């Protein structure tokens, strides 16, 4: 077999491969013999059909299948011989398929980029530290109470944070518009669910009262037909209900699976959850900084095949997340290309760090991570056992642990600054923290 390779771009390779005719004929004859053993032809006993008849009936198909098998096998042999690492399936261009002659074809494909990860010592990391103070715990208890707010009918005028049951009809230029009317809608004043001025205009209203609100849709309103237009809403208040926060009692604690331990037991469990969230938030922020630093220090070209595959995965995820009667390939690829490129490049960089430093998942850390996740459930032992009985889930945890070990490897050489902050700042999402 003859093989020559041409580098057409930084990542694209063009393999010209010639396979001796004898190998093709051997593969064709093998196919024909397999067919002869199974062929059922009237007038002949199974396995006794003359080869001339087999060739007449099945020769063309046998040759086509044999050529396909030889191309697949010879391509694999060629990339091994040339020490190439394909990043996707090849495009095959046949040059000569004539029977009795050598098979000639060209395979065009991309390879994985070859590089060494560098620049660890130039990465600056701010590592936060924080504790869950008693005041943080008190704030969390209030949040939990508000999340379980109940509303009771109030015989008074509406205030902010009250829940109103309303009917309304909206009109633009004297005409009702699609989506502008509803009956029996529950609306909490101050929730900002409606356009500016709508909720404010109902403060002070009582059950049975009708109010007319003259408002204007925001210029950036999502419905362009309504953006910036004046509108009139006629609103009827059916009822006014005031919020009632639940008491911190056994009934409330039971909603969270905590029984017979009282307020102190409840505070202990909530604190544990907050501390777990704090550890995860700090770890996540450090990881994001490390990954950003690796990206900046290691610009690499991405194989188009990998990028295309990742875009397709993100399309499928988007459809699964948001639903709707739409097929993944109907979503524009441009929406996902930036995210896809980041994920592909990081995947290549992380894999190279693992290779360079010969990293393997630390099984002690794997168990610790599983136990940490399991501690959020009422039966943690069962959760741990479930992970160790499911190879797919267990391997996913191993992958996460391996990424953490990559982060640790970078941190050993990066410029790390420790900073003590409040619990609230530590758990705040990175985007929100940057905006402050």
From Swiss-Prot:
MF terms in GO: peptidyl-prolyl cis-trans isomerase activity; protein folding chaperone; ribosome binding
Principal location: cytoplasm
GO cellular component: cytoplasm
Known catalytic reactions: [protein]-peptidylproline (omega=180) = [protein]-peptidylproline (omega=0)
Gene3D superfamilies associated with the record: 3.10.50.40, Trigger factor ribosome-binding domain, Trigger factor, C-terminal domain
HAMAP family, A to Z: Trigger_factor_Tig
Known function: Involved in protein export. Acts as a chaperone by maintaining the newly synthesized protein in an open conformation. Functions as a peptidyl-prolyl cis-trans isomerase.
Protein name: Trigger factor
Organism, as annotated: Pseudomonas fluorescens (strain SBW25)
